[in-house]
From Swiss-Prot:
Gene3D superfamilies: 3.90.950.10
Reaction(s) catalysed by this chain's protein: XTP + H2O = XDP + phosphate + H(+); ITP + H2O = IDP + phosphate + H(+)
Protein name, as recorded: Probable inosine/xanthosine triphosphatase
EC number(s) reported in the record: 3.6.1.73
Function of the molecule: Phosphatase that hydrolyzes non-canonical purine nucleotides such as XTP and ITP to their respective diphosphate derivatives. Probably excludes non-canonical purines from DNA/RNA precursor pool, thus preventing their incorporation into DNA/RNA and avoiding chromosomal lesions.
A single BP term in Gene Ontology: nucleotide metabolic process
GO molecular function terms attached to this record: ITPase activity; metal ion binding; nucleotide binding; ribonucleoside triphosphate phosphatase activity
Organism classification: Archaea, Thermoproteota, Thermoprotei, Thermoproteales, Thermoproteaceae
Assembly information from the UniProt record: Homodimer.
SUPFAM superfamilies to which the protein is assigned, alphabetical: ITPase-like (SSF52972)
Class of enzymatic activity (EC top level): hydrolase
Family: Belongs to the YjjX NTPase family.
Domain of life: Archaea
Length: 178
């Protein structure tokens, strides 16, 4: 199976490959550039989901031989007055069938929140605050906060696993293709 992913981030590419393999779908993951106009940090659940889906559709269109397009987008959501970072994965196939999954979410440190709510990417804000370059391509902010117990790849992997769940053969009868 050929899977196009709208990212060049090795962390996301590895998470996609591992999630597909976990469910028995051997996948060749092909990176493509992200779609134009993607915001540095989507804010709100709908915005995060929209850009995950935009990435998935863009990836599929950019790779004519691909069976699936995958988009992974992280962003900020507010829940009961708390701001959380969440990752959403969207998968689209050639028939237009879309499945979506999320990662666990974590509370964004208040020291970073102001800049993030002003539209600055959480990764860039964390890099400046913690003095750790390219954190988004490594352990992610969650890796810094948990001292490596949970890493960004874990969140990406979980989101892709959840997006793949409706596509498992035993689940197909329980989901309606849109």
């Amino acid at each position: 199976m050929k899977v196009a992913a709208a990212t060049r981030n090795p962390n996301k590419l590895r998470a996609i490959r591992e999630a597909y393999r976990t469910f028995g779908f051997p996948a060749e993951v092909v990176p493509v550039d992200k779609p134009p106009g993607a915001p540095p940090q989507p804010i709100g659940l709908d915005a995060v989901a929209k850009w995950a889906l935009e990435r998935a559709r863009h990836a599929l269109a950019a790779a004519p031989g691909a069976d699936h397009g995958v988009g992974i987008e992280a962003g900020v959501v507010e829940v009961a007055g708390y701001h959380l970072d969440i990752t959403i994965a969207a998968i689209v196939d050639r028939e237009g069938y879309v499945t979506v999954g999320t990662s666990p979410a974590f509370q964004i440190p208040t020291a970073l929140l102001h800049d993030v709510l002003q539209g600055r990417e959480l990764g860039a804000t964390a890099e400046a605050h913690y003095g750790r370059p390219a954190v988004g391509y490594r352990e992610g902010i969650i890796g810094l906060l948990t001292r490596g117990v949970v890493k960004r790849i874990d969140l990406n992997y979980a989101a892709v696993l959840m997006a793949l769940t409706p596509r498992l053969p035993h689940n197909a009868p329980h989901y309606r293709k849109a």
